Amino acid sequence: MKRGYEVLRDPHLNKGMAFTLEERQQLNIHGLLPPCFLGQDVQVFSILKNFERLTSDLDRYILLMSLQDRNEKLFYKVLTSDIERFMPIVYTPTVGLACQQYGLAFRRPRGLFITIHDRGHIATMLKSWPESVIKAIVVTDGERILGLGDLGCYGMGIPVGKLALYTACGGVKPHECLPVMLDVGTDNEALLKDPLYIGLRHKRIRGQAYDDLLDEFMEAVTSRYGMNCLIQFEDFANANAFRLLHKYRNKYCTFNDDIQGTASVAVAGLLAALRITKNRLSDHTVLFQGAGEAALGIANLIVMAMEKEGVSKEAAVKRIWMVDSKGLIVKGRASLTAEKTRFAHEHAEMKNLEDIVKDIKPSVLIGVAAIGGAFTKEILQDMAAFNKRPIIFALSNPTSKAECTAEQCYKYTEGRGIFASGSPFDPVTLPNGKTLYPGQGNNSYVFPGVALGVIACGLKHIGEDVFLTTAEVIAEQVSEENLQEGRLYPPLVTIQHVSLKIAVRIAEEAYRNNTASTYPQPKDLEAFIQSQIYSTDYNSFVADSYTWPEEAMKVKL
């Protein structure tokens, strides 16, 4: 146990002025703090006052990250006190701005920075990390950060923010989490010329050297932390994201949140929307604006969900259309990847989205191309003309990249649009006086619960069924009252409860399918998982002190 000033410098131990007099004396920190004794609730109040005083979200982000650096328990107590308020600061959309200005926002290193020049020594670098038990890793190479492109080493803000939500939303213990940046360079010329840039100053290394780095990283992680260590891939470029997922998914405990997490939360929204449209998913025609990893991930999970309804895979695929930067994806068109070819249908080539919507007449329109304003007034009005209750998902992040706003959707569909977005939007009051609360299809509904469940039961491989199960659980948590208010997702204030339900369902299915490795199987899974959840309350550091009977300490001659 640390003593003296080291206690105050360790964010895992530091309680600030919440240390009692007895703790201060026993830990040799009496006199190193003002003679004031505050409860954690007062400390939260103090942080909130400072938070409200700031006018920019980037400054608020820096305030919260600085708190995380000095008092971890208080940081998570603040986050969980109002998750709806703080999630947009520690994650999307503010984390995107923080990543763009990471050189300015950088205060203290968090996580592990591994570069292409460290090949052959990654196992040694992992030993530098102070924690020997790691259950979850979020790793990025910074090539496709949100909808912002190649941010190189500045992308470290994403794994840091993601793991903060593992804890705040899912209760995964923060000291068992590790953010990792794999720095192979950047093709962003502005960053290469930026004197504040904190990463390698050369073009991205690709090819065999890149693959060798990834292989060594995966082997080193599992060698040190075990095959059950969850490795989440985050914000890799499309080509690498799919390739690496296919390469590693059956060998390691891994998933890609941009592909599978986004898919799960989108399908959850669709399943909830079906309670409004009163039909089956396989009755719908789905059109995607975008055909990258998010779109393809959602499309593949929709196919799985339709199959579960009893439709053949071929019939399900025919219900899904995609538009990429070159137009409608059709058979015979040039420049199609293997993933895109699956959703290429017999049709004339078309480029203009408005014309495509008129021709395909979709009942579901999903935007994941990070093209702000792509869903024009005409497109939204057409969707309302084709459908009694059109489903419109503008899932691109950050807010500036959203295909349309909630207000535009409701306005141009005469309030009939069923809307969800990737970034938060304010409530919208319709001309009839009814107020709708747009559903935010944030991946935060997915990955914390998935991580908690995977860790709790020791799942070694994460199949697509996990993400369909997760989508079903999320949709089940949406009440009729939520749907009446326009919400397709449970209120964010309930996200910890939702994560627990996801974790329990994942664990139940893992034990039923004999894919769990934590044995014996707990009799009460929910109680067991609840016992694993991180507590934001302070620990007591007062030594366990007691007396013996005086007679027991006497030596008789």
UniProtKB/Swiss-Prot annotation:
Main localisation: cytoplasm
GO annotation, cellular component aspect: mitochondrion
EC number(s) reported in the record: 1.1.1.40
UniProt xrefs under PROSITE patterns: MALIC_ENZYMES
Binding site for a divalent metal cation: E234, D235, D258
SMART domains: malic, Malic_M
Enzymatic reactions: (S)-malate + NADP(+) = pyruvate + CO2 + NADPH; oxaloacetate + H(+) = pyruvate + CO2
Top-rank taxon, per record: Eukaryota
Active site: Y91, K162
Cofactor(s) listed in the protein's UniProt record: Mg(2+); Mn(2+)
Feature type site, description Important for activity: D258
UniProt KW keywords: Cytoplasm, Metal-binding, NADP, Oxidoreductase
Gene Ontology BP terms: malate metabolic process
EC category: oxidoreductase
UniProt-listed InterPro entries: Aminoacid_DH-like_N_sf, Malic_enzyme_CS, Malic_N_dom, Malic_N_dom_sf, Malic_NAD-bd, Malic_OxRdtase, NAD(P)-bd_dom_sf
Subcellular location field: Cytoplasm
Chain positions recorded as NADP(+) binding sites: 144, 258, 290-307, 397
Pfam families (alphabetical): malic, Malic_M
Family listed: Belongs to the malic enzymes family.
Listed name of the protein: NADP-dependent malic enzyme
Taxonomic source organism: Anas platyrhynchos (Mallard)
Organismal lineage: Eukaryota, Metazoa, Chordata, Craniata, Vertebrata
Gene expressing this chain: ME1
